[in-house]
Amino acid sequence: MSAPKKRKSDIHSDDRDHADHQTKKEKHWFEEKSEQNGENRRSSIFKGFLKKVKSSTTLKSTNKSASSSKMDTIANETHLSITSESSITSVESCHSAQFPNVAKNAMLRTLVNRDSFTPVPPPDGESVTFILPEIGSSKLEFTSKMDDAISIESRMSIGSCHTIDEDSASIGSTSVFCTPSRNPLMRNGLRMSTRSVPENQDDMPPALFRSLCNSAVRRVPTSKSEGGGTPMRRSMRMSIQKRNLSSKNMEDVPEEEALTVSNSSIRVDAPIAEEDEEVFGAAKEYFDNNVTSHNDSADEGTCSMSRLSTTSERASGVGGSSIFQGRRSSIFRKIFPGKSESKDRRMSDNNQASEQYMDKKSRRASVVSFNEFTSVSGLSVNDSASKNPKDLTESPQQPKLRKKTASSSNLSQRISSVFRMGSNSTVKLNEYVPSPIVSQSSRRNTLTGNSSISSGVGSIASGTSDQGYGTIGSRSGQSISRCGSRRDDEGKKERTRRLLDRIIISDVPAGELLKLKIEQVKKQKQLEMDELFETQLTESSSSDTSQSENLQFDVVAVDIKADGSPFSTTAATFMDSELSKRVKEEIVSNYRPDRCGSITEYEPELVFVMPEQPQASLKSLNDSVSSNADINLDHLRNVRSGLCKSIEEWKRITKMRESSTMLIYPMFCQSEEEWDSKGTIDAIFLMLDGILMNTKRWMPNGKCILAGVTPNNVILLRNKFDELKLSVAISESDGPASSNDDFDTQSTASTSTVFGAKI
């Protein structure tokens, strides 16, 4: 019989023939697997693919990545093993099991010490202190004396502190990084599995150093679902303490409800001890006896609103020392109330007495207005504090209001609903508030779009808040209406009065006034040179008293071109060649982007304004109001800007004077069609009204003389000025508006201050 044919696989020697061969069970987890060529080979491609899928799924489920050449760092430093949450006895007795003997591994300890996280003792004997960074609630401090014992303070979630005394050599070793522990900030507190090197393997092969590091360092879960627990917040621990405290003082509540009551009001009967020098009078004594304190539960997102209690609550309470006497909230007791539990028992003890005597009218207008009388729910403090408990219980009991949790999400809706309820009902304050402060809320006509009954907090329409909100003033002891159109009309009237006081309409055209002013200046100069000319001047000026009043201006505003030459004929009558040269030098030397300037070394002082650069034809609001279809828009823009810039420059150069007067006229007008146009006249008065809206833009004691370009233009300006006077006189003759009207308080017959327009 022939010998069997040798195969290629028989040439390789078997590892089991060697003496130092170890089986799979005898091999340690950190030893490297030596795979031979024919060993552990997959039989097919599909089995290898399934094996790869299973290995990747396992890595994803355990949240561990493959080994890399770099050592993984600890992502969450609060997971160090020096803090532990175990029982009080196991912290002190079982600490030796938590720190295995890993200190013998010299190579790993050397690597960690090289990273300068664990302190290395210095060669000399000096005492050097190493302070590790703060980790969670623990702080480690090492000294160079390795034989000294250190104390690790571990703050437990139960609120007590315990110490662990260990040798500094073992704690400072790599066991800090490799030892499994319980995390005190985790709710479940389970230990996380970590491998440690056995004692019989002291010498570690260099080839396995990487696998040891990757397995020794604990990997932190990346998601909350894989972490096995979420950190316990401080608010959660406080709520647990509240529940434990409330369960000890609620014997009458069933056991299944004892832990659900976490938001209760503690009745404080004894006043808080204060210093002797702090005396608050009767108000302090009242609040000490009648204020119910409340606890805010921030973790559950609710807040209990404090309310003022009365003296009857103290008399009707079960006892001053009893705490947390809440109502029973089980569904069975709500549906089938027993005979022993009456309706008064099911009502809350905190607001029982206050809701018994609150009538329907006071509940609908429950606005606490903190003024001199301090009315609380329609009653003053003295009245509510001095009432007898018997009188309160004898009043007819009203049905209980629907109670709703006062969270921050619907707080604004509740406030506005209170204001709406107060505005719908007419509140009589004669019984609670003294007679001088009496006002009634009335319905307004909503056709004008200014209704006093709205859903926002801004329109506080309750009777109690009428006396302190939105009242501009009072006429004949009555409060002015808060209607928006009325307030706007009053503001326009005030600006119109200011305009009438600060604007003087000249009966002489501006060109003639400038000529007379030049003559007056020349005469004054001659008067200084020759005293004999004084008598002749007084005789000649006695007949022109009306014109001399309009000549009392010290500043004149003119319109010029970009090269310094006069723009209009009115400016040309005042500016000669010498003055035009000085204006041109001022423009070149002191260029200003606002295209205006002044010359103060002249009498009268000169304010010059240049026209605006032409822009695209965009119709503005003022152009549409003035209805200037026949006038160029650039012309109106120059009229308004010229007037505005001249007034601002006039205020700047005369801010140190007590008073000043400036002559103005319609600027940048070159034809009769332009200066006599209704749009030009309206633009002038609208700009003056807009400037006087802010008094800071006007000279404090300054006035302007408005003169026309031609005699016809003077008449048109005078007519517009008289219309403003008439509108103010008619509105003042209307008298005070009645607050009991069913329509808007503004009279339909009155004339508005929109210049010349009737409502």
From Swiss-Prot:
Q: Give the UniProt subcellular location, in the record's own words.
A: Nucleus; Cytoplasm; Cytoplasm, Cell cortex; Cleavage furrow
Q: Please tell me whether the keyword Nucleus is annotated for this protein.
A: yes
What does the record note as the disruption phenotype of the gene behind this chain? Mutant embryos do not display the anterior cortical contractions associated with pseudocleavage and do not form a pseudocleavage furrow. Cortical actin foci remain uniformly distributed rather than the asymmetric distribution seen in wild-type embryos. Approximately 20% of mutant embryos fail to hatch. Those that do hatch are viable and fertile and display normal P granule localization. Increased embryonic lethality in par-1, par-2 and par-3 mutants.
- Signal peptide span per the entry? none
Compositional bias segments (type: Polar residues): 473-482, 736-759
Bias regions of kind Low complexity — which residues? 448-465
Q: Where is this region: Disordered?
A: 1-46, 334-361, 379-413, 440-495, 732-759
An example GO biological process term is: mitotic cytokinesis
Q: Which residue stretches does the UniProt record annotate as biased composition, category Basic and acidic residues? A: 10-42, 485-495
Q: Give the main localization category.
A: nucleus
Task: Provide the Gene Ontology terms for cellular component.
Answer: cell cortex; cleavage furrow; cytoplasm; nucleus
Q: Does the keyword Lipid biosynthesis apply?
A: no
Job of this protein = Required for formation of the pseudocleavage furrow during the first cleavage of the embryo and also mediates aster-induced furrowing during cytokinesis. Promotes cortical recruitment of ani-1 and nmy-2 during pseudocleavage and cytokinesis and promotes the accumulation of actin at furrowing regions. Regulates establishment of embryonic cell polarity.
- Report the protein name in the record: Pseudocleavage protein nop-1
